[in-house]
Amino acid sequence: MKGSRWFIVFIVAFLFIMFAIEYHLPKNFVWKPTFGHHDEQPFGCAVFDSVLSSSLPQGYTFSRKSLYQLEQEDTTQRRGILVISDNLRLSDVDVNALLKMAERGDKIMLVSTLFGRYLEDTLQFRSYYSYFSPMALKKYATSFMKKDSLHWIGDSTVYPRQTFYFYLQLCSSYFWGDSLPERVLAQRVFESNEFRYETEVDSLTTDSLVYMPVAMSRRWGKGEVILVSTPLIFTNYGMLDGKNATYIFRLLSQMGKLPIVRTEGYMKETAPVSYTHLRAHETKANL
């Protein structure tokens, strides 16, 4: 009986130790893009926001307001507005609000793979969307395939030209080269055969390389609208991916010395009531 009791004690102790070890082991990563302020997974923004709030001397704050709500705020201080999403289909109300803010001198940075036709028509650009697959990213990373390159070509008097390397799935969306931006900040480089295969377009180019913008800006009034097609880089993963945080800071530096407000108002679970719904409610209340 005494031996059995010690055996039971040993088993219980062993199970307790194994439970403690498993509890402290790193949890499996979830590669779903959320861009959430409290999400510590690779494609959340908990670390991203924390680093920026402690690194940007001009200030970095977080909001859940829509562009319309931000535009309606009574403030004389100019700001940088940052919106990160994988599907930013802005309505005409959103677009008009952001253009009003830019007109006054604010700088608006929109980071997404999709922007909506109204904004594209207004600013005269077109984007190429590529679907993100976590399984494809995992397969690409574990096969040790060569990373794709993004070339910084912004103002060389401020930053030297530099090449940054990312997995293909993080930078597979871009803007068409015949878009009419005022200034290209960064571009992705394709081999011409790869470009024809990916876009299914019969390119007439005879060059061996094709350059497509992934970040560009356009002045609007006293301010600026900055478009970036690689939202997965603006995450915890992108911030912690070796030296690639430099790429993020270069893009954010386009807002100059303005304090930056990142709004989470266009995430599905936190999206505010739309302007049209607000107006409809107000109309009913006044009847």
Tell what function each PLM region has.
Residues Y174-V273:
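A glycine-centered loop/beta-turn motif at secondary-structure junctions
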Residues K2-E71:
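Aromatic-Pro/Gly-enriched surface loop or interdomain linker
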Residues R64-F144:
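Membrane-embedded segments
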Residues P42-F43, R89-D92, G242:
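Soluble non-cytosolic domains of exported or imported proteins
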Residues T34-D39, S85-D86, Y237:
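Second-shell loop/turn segments in exported
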Residues L114-L204:
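An acidic, glycine-rich "communication" segment
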Residues T276-A285:
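Conserved small/polar residues in nucleotide/adenosyl-binding loops
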